């Protein structure tokens, strides 16, 4: 058994779990950290699918009571049907654009330099959004209209650019469109479920032949650490947004992005391709 590979898998799982739901871009961090620790490119695409599944199942577990109640009430409750329809409406824009452009995006933007630029720009957008005086008008997820959901879904399109952050685009977009901080954050969590399951299913079908029994320990390690770290991150973020802004994440993005760009410019790394 390759213990070094398992250690790298654990690191990648932790990175995925901690960054998937914080507005700092999980894809961007996986690209950068994967390059730094020289993670096995042979299983890279498949491994990312596995750890994303671990992260999203952590959300399902955290909100299992709410999800179960919605499933039970769906045939009879207008509110439950509205909630599901809002998720579908918010899911579709990024899903459609993603299907059309994913090959182009992966060809040109899946590199650490592009990620660094997106990190910096995204950080500046968060700082700008936090400084705007915007009165929240939606204080419960159940009060969101279909138009609110569509606006969040359109904001999610930006997350197709690696380094932007799916959670960042949906949370900040939701706040700009009138959702309060907690509602925007929780709706982002729920919206992650269909978008990430769809992405996972697509990648599984595309890379099915790369799943081998020999790699199960690596996959299992990454999955476990992604699940546990995502569970901690989701709970922590909900408590955090109750009394804090997202400025700390914005500054982290900016500093991290500038470090990457500076390292590349000085020739310390060769990550442009």
From Swiss-Prot:
One of its GO terms (cellular component) is plasma membrane. Keywords: Antibiotic resistance, Cell inner membrane, Cell membrane, Cell shape, Cell wall biogenesis/degradation, Hydrolase, Membrane, Peptidoglycan synthesis, Transmembrane, Transmembrane helix. Catalyzes the dephosphorylation of undecaprenyl diphosphate (UPP). Confers resistance to bacitracin. The keyword Membrane applies. It holds the Pfam family BacA. One of its GO terms (molecular function) is undecaprenyl-diphosphatase activity. This is Undecaprenyl-diphosphatase. It catalyses: di-trans,octa-cis-undecaprenyl diphosphate + H2O = di-trans,octa-cis-undecaprenyl phosphate + phosphate + H(+). GO terms for biological process: cell wall organization; peptidoglycan biosynthetic process; regulation of cell shape; response to antibiotic. Bacitracin is thought to be involved in the inhibition of peptidoglycan synthesis by sequestering undecaprenyl diphosphate, thereby reducing the pool of lipid carrier available. Its main location: membrane. InterPro entries: UppP (IPR003824). It comes from Laribacter hongkongensis (strain HLHK9). It is an enzyme of class 3 (hydrolase). Signal peptide: none annotated. It is found in: Cell inner membrane. Coiled coil: none annotated. Belongs to the UppP family. The chain crosses the membrane at residues 43-63, 82-102, 109-129, 185-205, 214-234, 249-269. Its EC number is 3.6.1.27.
């Amino acid at each position: 058994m390759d213990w070094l590979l398992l250690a790298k898998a654990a690191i990648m799982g932790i990175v995925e779990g901690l960054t998937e739901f914080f507005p700092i871009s999980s894809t961007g961090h996986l690209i950068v950290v994967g390059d730094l620790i020289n993670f096995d490119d042979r299983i890279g695409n498949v491994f990312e699918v596995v750890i994303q599944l671990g992260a999203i199942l952590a959300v399902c577990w955290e909100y299992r009571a709410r999800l179960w109640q919605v499933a039970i009430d769906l045939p009879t409750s207008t509110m439950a049907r509205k909630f599901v329809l809002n998720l579908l409406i918010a899911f579709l824009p990024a899903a459609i654009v993603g299907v059309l452009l994913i090959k182009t995006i992966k060809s040109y933007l899946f590199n650490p330099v592009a990620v660094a630029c997106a990190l910096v720009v995204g950080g500046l957008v968060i700082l700008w959004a936090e400084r705007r005086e915007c009165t929240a008008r939606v204080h419960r997820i159940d009060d969101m209209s279909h138009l609110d959901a569509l606006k969040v879904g359109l904001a999610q399109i930006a997350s197709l650019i690696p380094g932007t952050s799916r959670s960042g685009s949906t949370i900040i977009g939701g706040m700009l469109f009138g959702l309060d901080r907690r509602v925007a954050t929780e709706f982002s969590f729920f919206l992650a479920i269909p978008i990430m399951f769809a992405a996972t299913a697509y990648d599984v079908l595309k890379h099915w032949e790369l799943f081998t029994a020999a790699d199960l320990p690596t996959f299992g390690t990454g999955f476990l650490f992604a699940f546990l770290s995502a569970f901690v991150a989701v709970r922590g973020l909900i408590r955090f947004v109750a009394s804090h802004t997202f400025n700390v994440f914005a500054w982290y993005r900016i500093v991290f992005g500038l470090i990457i760009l500076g390292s590349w410019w000085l020739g310390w790394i060769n990550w442009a391709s």
